[in-house]
């Protein structure tokens, strides 16, 4: 890629220096660093090309969140006001550069709660349909078929997935439609809520933003940052409420987004192990990805424990 051409297309002045290669890699793309007289920028190159229309809502939502004070990198548009530029056959976009730490599910739960409340306060009613990724089950037949394929190909995690299969199916019986649909981030795992050098956090990767139930997204956050720790769960929810967050987690169905999303992540990771691809180019990476669920599963008992924790009377 040509750093000078990237700078020109995005209206950046002075000498431009592009990193020799990607400095970060995620499931959806890679990130390069661009240094210019107008500051440092993250150049994001998606694995799967997107259209301007597909990214319009999510980019506007991130821009609105940035204006409202949510700690997130500001997107940089091209000189023509576009999200993407096509340079040398490569589709890319720019964000302001932020120095970030490693993913940490042990972040201060109160800080996480405050940030999620701020995001939910930005998002308004969203008329679009909720993506099946966040609401549909994988289904017993698909789980059984996947386990059979993994066992036949000698996947090292196949037996563990088979043991968890009945639990995954029972969890899917909890699924309920979203009650209140607003624009949400939809991807607030610890990979995307990262610590900063100043002691705060920065929320990245807004590409999946879209319609969802804030209560269901809050339940995802609750599991990710509290797990089985009742004290962390209460601290997160209390901070969320005190910061004006509009949602609550009060029944098993509020874990619908978590159950659907982790189910589909598990399915995709297993499928990637069977068929490596640019998102998961090697089987070791796919095995590690599915291990994130198998090593610390979201069982009904754990989720009910979180419900009890956040709904218990406070002293």
Where on the chain are the PLM-derived regions?
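ATP/Mg2+ or Mg2+-diphosphate-binding catalytic cores
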Residues: 137, 145, 149-153, 267-315
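ATP-binding pocket architecture of kinase catalytic cores
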Residues: 36-128
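Conserved NTP-binding catalytic cores of kinases and kinase-like/nucleotidyltransferase enzymes
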Residues: 1-79, 196-198, 308-315
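Active-site acidic catalytic loop and adjacent metal/ATP-binding pocket
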Residues: 25-37, 42-43, 75, 169-218
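All-alpha amphipathic helical-bundle segments outside canonical DNA-binding/catalytic cores
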Residues: 247-258
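A cross-family kinase active-site recognition segment
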Residues: 103-159, 179-181, 284
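Short Pro/Gly-enriched beta-strand edge/turn motifs at strand-loop
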Residues: 11-18, 166-177
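Active-site activation/catalytic loop segments of kinase-like enzymes and analogous catalytic loops
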Residues: 214-246, 260-278
């Amino acid at each position: 890629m040509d750093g000078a051409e990237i700078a020109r297309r995005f209206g950046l002045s002075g000498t431009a220096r592009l990193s020799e290669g990607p400095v970060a890699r995620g499931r959806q793309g890679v990130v390069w660093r661009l240094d210019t007289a107008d500051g440092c920028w993250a150049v994001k190159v998606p694995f799967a090309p997107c259209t301007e229309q597909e990214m319009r809502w999510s980019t506007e939502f991130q821009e609105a969140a940035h204006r409202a004070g949510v700690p997130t990198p500001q997107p940089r548009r091209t000189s023509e006001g576009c999200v993407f530029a096509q340079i040398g056959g490569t589709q890319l976009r720019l964000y302001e550069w932020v120095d970030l730490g490693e993913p940490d599910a042990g972040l201060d739960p109160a800080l996480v709660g405050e940030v999620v409340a701020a995001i939910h306060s930005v998002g308004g009613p969203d008329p679009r349909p909720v993506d099946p990724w966040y609401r549909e089950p994988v289904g017993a037949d698909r789980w059984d078929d996947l386990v059979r394929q993994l066992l036949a190909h000698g996947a090292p995690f196949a037996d563990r997935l088979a043991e968890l299969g009945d639990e995954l199916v029972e969890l899917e019986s909890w699924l309920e439609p979203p009650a209140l649909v607003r624009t949400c981030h939809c991807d607030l795992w610890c990979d995307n809520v990262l610590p900063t050098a100043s002691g705060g956090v920065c929320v990245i990767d807004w590409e999946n933003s879209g319609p969802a139930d804030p209560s269901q997204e809050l339940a995802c956050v609750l599991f990710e940052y509290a797990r089985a720790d009742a004290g962390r769960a209460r601290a997160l929810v209390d901070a969320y409420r005190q910061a004006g967050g509009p949602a609550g987690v009060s029944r098993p169905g509020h874990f619908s987004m978590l159950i659907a999303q982790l189910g589909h992540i598990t399915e995709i990771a297993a499928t990637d192990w069977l068929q490596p691809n640019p998102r998961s180019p090697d089987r070791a990476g796919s095995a590690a990805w599915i291990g994130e669920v198998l090593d610390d599963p979201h069982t009904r008992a754990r989720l009910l424990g979180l419900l009890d924790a956040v709904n218990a009377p406070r002293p």
